[in-house]
């Protein structure tokens, strides 16, 4: 094989790896109305249903069980598996109306992320990690094969 052919094969392999979605279900941290991002919210992991394709995190500041003016306020964290549509709808609703971070008012914010356990942090913005270990292994093997095929002078 010529060196440009090897380069084309490597580029194609990298592209294919970036497009791979593995069958294993998404894993998200899950908890409900915890008083912080500790213990249960950092230790409970769920394999999501096949139709659930994002992890959602909600943080609220207010009183429980219902927000009420003048009551003792604190943070409440909830994490779950969701569909992208559910998460975006909730995020849009919260961010436009309720995500104020004003300490004397009740507020709520929602974050969506895609990738196994990406919702570790409360509002994470964590990047997606979709099988990059497998792709790196494949790329390393192809580079090794390419160096073996290129004639040495």
Curated annotation (Swiss-Prot):
Residues 125-153 form a propeptide. It comes from the Eukaryota. GPI-anchored. Residues 1-25 form the signal peptide. The chain crosses the membrane at residues 131-151. A lipid is attached at residue 124 (GPI-anchor amidated serine). Disulfide bonds join 28-55, 31-41, 48-81, 87-112, 99-109, 113-118. Glycans are attached at residue 33. GO terms for cellular component: cytoplasm; endoplasmic reticulum membrane; endosome membrane; plasma membrane; septate junction; side of membrane. One of its GO terms (biological process) is establishment of blood-brain barrier. Residues 26-130 are extracellular. The keyword Membrane applies. Keywords: Cell junction, Cell membrane, Disulfide bond, Endoplasmic reticulum, Endosome, Glycoprotein, GPI-anchor, Lipoprotein, Membrane, Signal, Transmembrane, Transmembrane helix. It is a lipid-anchor; GPI-anchor. Expressed in all tissues that form septate junctions, including hindgut, trachea, epidermis and dorsal pouch. Expressed in subperineurial glial cells that form the hemolymph-brain barrier of the central nervous system. Required for septate junction assembly, possibly by organizing the preassembly and transport of septate junction proteins such as dlg1/disks large 1 and Nrx-IV/Neurexin-IV. Involved in paracellular barrier functions of trachea, hindgut and salivary gland mediated by epithelial cell septate junctions. Involved in paracellular barrier functions of the hemolymph-brain barrier (insect blood-brain barrier) mediated by glial cell septate junctions. Required for maintenance of septate junctions in imaginal disk epithelial cells. Involved in the epithelial cell wound-healing response. Belongs to the snake toxin-like superfamily. This is UPAR/Ly6 domain-containing protein cold.
């Amino acid at each position: 094989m010529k060196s440009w052919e090897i380069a084309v094969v490597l580029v194609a392999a990298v592209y294919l790896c970036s497009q791979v979605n593995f069958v294993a279900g998404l894993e998200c941290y899950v908890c409900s109305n915890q008083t912080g991002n500790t213990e249960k919210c950092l230790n409970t992991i769920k394999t999501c249903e096949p139709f659930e394709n994002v992890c959602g995190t909600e943080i609220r500041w207010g009183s429980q069980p219902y927000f009420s003016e003048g009551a003792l306020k604190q943070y409440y964290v909830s994490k779950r598996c969701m569909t992208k549509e559910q998460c975006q709808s909730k995020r849009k609703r919260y961010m436009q109306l309720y995500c104020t971070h004003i300490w004397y008012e009740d507020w709520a914010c929602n974050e969506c992320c895609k990738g196994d356990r990406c919702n570790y942090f409360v509002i994470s913005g964590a990047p997606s990690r979709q099988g990059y270990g497998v792709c790196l292994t494949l790329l390393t093997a192809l580079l090794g094969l390419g160096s073996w095929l290129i004639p040495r002078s």
